[in-house]
Amino acid sequence: MTNEPAGLGGLRVLVTRPAHQADTLCRLIERAGGEALRLPLLSIEPMAPALVARQFELARAFDWWIFTSANAVRHARTIDGGAWPGGLAAVGPATAAALEAASGSDVLAPLQGASSEALLARVELQNLSGKRVLIVTGADGLDQLSMELQVRGATVVTVAVYHRVPLPHAADAVEATLKRAKAIIITSGQALEHLLDLTPESARAALLKKQLVVPSGRVVEMAQTLGFAAPALAPEQMSDAAILHCLESWWKPQAQKT
């Protein structure tokens, strides 16, 4: 048995994931010696099922269906119980696992990382001339993915199966939670903007000093533009294990300073 302290000992982490997706990550943080604080910023709500179901029917014979998140898989399967095409792809391993479970089929996924760019690096998606592709995503999904697929010759249809709804929180509760947190896990650019909107002016300067963990380079740049002092951290993927590793790598030298 080791006498070394837990990897996140002394670290309070604010988890802003939707409530139904936060439990496992919070348990991992606490198992590593940290304290997980919860402040869900967005809820994930389904789009009108009748319209979405019609879009799935029209795309039944498409060559590829590409899913951008596990939420997209979950809501798509709730709406559409039919057979999905043989060409299924996912932008990362967590989405791929959800898609394999929902479809019972093999799924094309990035060889490394979790992003549309990583998926687009796969040889199977290089020449799409004459191919039809359905992107299954959330509202305000990955326009860059659609544009690149079209550049490669594909006819692309995008279907949004869910949308994110900002959740209200009392200003004093937000301020009290932020005072305790040293790091904040952010799930999207929309979530980051909403956190800033929720933060009272009296707590804004303190918020901008927090360490952020974000899902992509785009949100890293957004955080910098919004005035966060420390560069945001972007794990290779937003899986629970990758986020935990990212936090531990950052926190170890910080903890040694105290």
What are these regions (language model features)?
Residues 1-258:
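Signature of uroporphyrinogen-III synthase
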